[in-house]
Each structure stands twice: as structure tokens, then as C-alpha cells.
Amino acid sequence: MKIYLVGGAVRDALLGLPVKDKDWVVVGATPQEMLDAGYQQVGRDFPVFLHPQTHEEYALARTERKSGSGYTGFTCYAAPDVTLEADLQRRDLTINALARDDDGQIIDPYHGRRDLEARLLRHVSPAFGEDPLRVLRVARFAARYAHLSFRIADETLALMREMTAAGELEHLTPERVWKETENALTTRNPQVYFQVLRDCGALRVLFPEIDALFGVPAPAKWHPEIDTGVHTLMTLSMAAMLSPQLDVRFATLCHDLGKGLTPKNLWPRHHGHGPAGVKLVEQLCQRLRVPNDLRDLAKLVAEYHDLIHTFPILQPKTIVKLFDAIDAWRKPQRVEQIALTSEADVRGRTGFEASDYPQGRWLREAWQVAQAVPTKEVVEAGFKGIEIREELTKRRIAAVANWKEKRCPNPAS
């Protein structure tokens, strides 16, 4: 029995990055030998065991053979005669097909170290084409390592295009698509994930609402980048700089979906695109089974982001109605989230990346003023039932009006 550290732990150690999870491969052992050594079996489809002390995963070396469609249609063979090289060959990328033995020696049969140095994401073998999930995984790796200047090898991107054109991605379940997308959205450069999917044709298959934005123009005065798809990815990039929150990033991605519905004869203007985009957000989230809290914020951002941009001319009554609409009294975090997504929208434009966004500050300040109005005083004044809400709203509007006159006067007044 020989044990090797494999995959991501070896890759990240060679890149000088923190190693989070360790996976191990065991060569020359049987399931019974693992059980006798105190390991606990957890793998259903193939033999995977948990170490009795560390609880890290130890898998018996195995090979895989395509036996059906999609990413689940594989037959696994795990036995003592499966070599380390054979196990590594079934992996997706050369940089993930690395192993390290007890002595610290790197085993690299598929030139993963060379590709690490060249900053290349390259598939190990043609078997890559048998698993459509790998298209999303490569896009996610491209996003994860974009800050290190990694790029996808030409032949790998070509294979990803072939897989997409062959309809392989249609076998992916919504849950798997969302899981990869969720992981990609938490990387330093989530926009790269969606750009790679577009480059290989997968964006049109998996995210048609986003793909439809490419080629849709916006007024050059407001959007020097002109293309709405390009703006969407620039905005997502900016959101990633402003916030690590998944919900902020996802909402930013969806903020302009309504522009894909504008008839061509009305281009480049997109009047009413915010409310129009809400249905598309709902559609995308339902299809991919996106969690409800992410969906709800994305719908609100789609509907109200343009309103935030016009904050100086908003009436105090409109500002308080906005807080009602986003349910800020029960979910105060939404004020900050919407301020961030609106800022990302403005700064996610060519030449505006370093712009100040005072509207975000004003929104936060107005919220502090509105929520500081004490409910207790309204109740003590004798108001009852629905009158409490009505009086509270009046007092909030008055407080915001007083604040706005001093801090953010209407430029037209």
C-alpha cells in the first residue's frame, strides 16, 4: 500500500498558495485493508475513506469509463492493480494531475508543473470531453487563477466548444450548474467565469438571459463601453472589488437583464428596463434553483438600481417608499447591498472605474435618519392599529426631508 497527496493541495503548494483541503490516493490496497486500518468508508459509487484521526479523504486509485450521458454516466474500477498514473489520467487538468509521495517527491506524468509555470489550463486527455461539468470547472479555475495570469490552452478551449456544440451541457442538472457558478462568483475575478462560458458557447446554453445582453448597445454618453454584455461583466468585476458577498455579486450580474428585452428599433435607449428585468431574474433563478435570498435581492436591484442613481432629485416620500419596497425595516442589510450594487453599476463603465458615488453615501445616511425615528413615541402619542404605521411613515418622511435639505438638496430647487 502506497499513499500519495494528490490534486489541488499539490497544485496550490507549488503555486505558493494556502492549502485548504487535502485529498489522498491509496495505491495497492483493498477496501477491507482500509477498514482493517481503521478508516471509515463513505464513498457510495467508489471506495473513499475517512482517516481515523484527520478525517481527510483517502480514495483507492481508480479508473473511469464512460457508460452513459452527462457527468454521472461513468463506470468506476478500483482495485490494487490500478496505478497512480492511471488514476491521475482520469483528472480534468494537468495542473490537477499531480501527486506527492511521503518523501516530498512530485509525481507528474502529464506535465502539470510545466503548465503551472506556463500558467496554462490544459486538459489531461481526450476523456475530458466525456464530462460536461468540466467545461464549468475550467471556467471556474480560469476565474480563480486569473490574478496569476492563467489562461486556457487553445486545444482545451476548442474541446470545450465541441462539447457545447454537441449538446453535452444539456445533461447538467440545475444544482450542479448553480454550485459551480456559486463557487465562481466567490473568486477574485468572477467575470472571467462568464467570459469563458461565452467564449465556448456555453453562456448561450446555460445563461441565455446574460448572453442576450452582448451586442445590445447603450447610449455612448453614459456607457463608453457601449455593449451591455461588456458592461455587465465590468460591473461584476467592480462588485467583486467592493464586496465579498455572494448576494451582492449575483445581484450585480443580473441588474441589467431587462435591456435584453428592448426592441431593436428603440436602441440604444432602454426605458423601463429595470422593472422589465425582474421577470428575467425570476426565470433564471427558478431554472437554476438559486436560493431565495439571492433571488429576492437580485429582483430588487434590477428594479431599483436606476432610482438610486437619481437620489439627489428624489422626494423624501419616495425615499421612504423605497425603504418600504426593499423591506429595509426587517432586512436592514439590503440598504448596504443595494448601495454597493448601484455603485458597481456606475463604476463598471469604461473611464468611470475610479468615480466617486455619493448616491451610495446619501442612501446610507437617509436610512440611518429614517430608522432612528422611534416607534415607541408614536405608540405613546395614542395612535393605534394602522394609524401607527401611517404616523410613523409621516415622521420618517419629515426626518428625511429635514436631513435632505441640509445634506443632499434637490439641484432643481
UniProtKB/Swiss-Prot annotation:
Its cofactor is Mg(2+); Ni(2+). Mg(2+) binds at residues 21, 23. Residues 228-329 form the HD domain. The keyword RNA-binding applies. Keywords: ATP-binding, Hydrolase, Magnesium, Metal-binding, Multifunctional enzyme, Nickel, Nucleotide-binding, Nucleotidyltransferase, RNA repair, RNA-binding, Transferase, tRNA processing. One of its GO terms (molecular function) is CCA tRNA nucleotidyltransferase activity. CTP binds at residues 8, 11, 91, 137, 140. The keyword RNA-binding applies. It catalyses: a tRNA precursor + 2 CTP + ATP = a tRNA with a 3' CCA end + 3 diphosphate; a tRNA with a 3' CCA end + 2 CTP + ATP = a tRNA with a 3' CCACCA end + 3 diphosphate. Its EC number is 2.7.7.72, 3.1.3.-, 3.1.4.-. ATP binds at residues 8, 11, 91, 137, 140. Magnesium is required for nucleotidyltransferase activity. Nickel for phosphatase activity. GO terms for biological process: RNA repair; tRNA 3'-terminal CCA addition. Comprises two domains: an N-terminal domain containing the nucleotidyltransferase activity and a C-terminal HD domain associated with both phosphodiesterase and phosphatase activities. Monomer. Can also form homodimers and oligomers. Catalyzes the addition and repair of the essential 3'-terminal CCA sequence in tRNAs without using a nucleic acid template. Adds these three nucleotides in the order of C, C, and A to the tRNA nucleotide-73, using CTP and ATP as substrates and producing inorganic pyrophosphate. tRNA 3'-terminal CCA addition is required both for tRNA processing and repair. Also involved in tRNA surveillance by mediating tandem CCA addition to generate a CCACCA at the 3' terminus of unstable tRNAs. While stable tRNAs receive only 3'-terminal CCA, unstable tRNAs are marked with CCACCA and rapidly degraded. NCBIfam families: PRK10885.1. Belongs to the tRNA nucleotidyltransferase/poly(A) polymerase family. Bacterial CCA-adding enzyme type 1 subfamily. A single active site specifically recognizes both ATP and CTP and is responsible for their addition. This is Multifunctional CCA protein. The lineage of its organism: Bacteria, Pseudomonadati, Pseudomonadota, Gammaproteobacteria, Enterobacterales. The gene is cca.
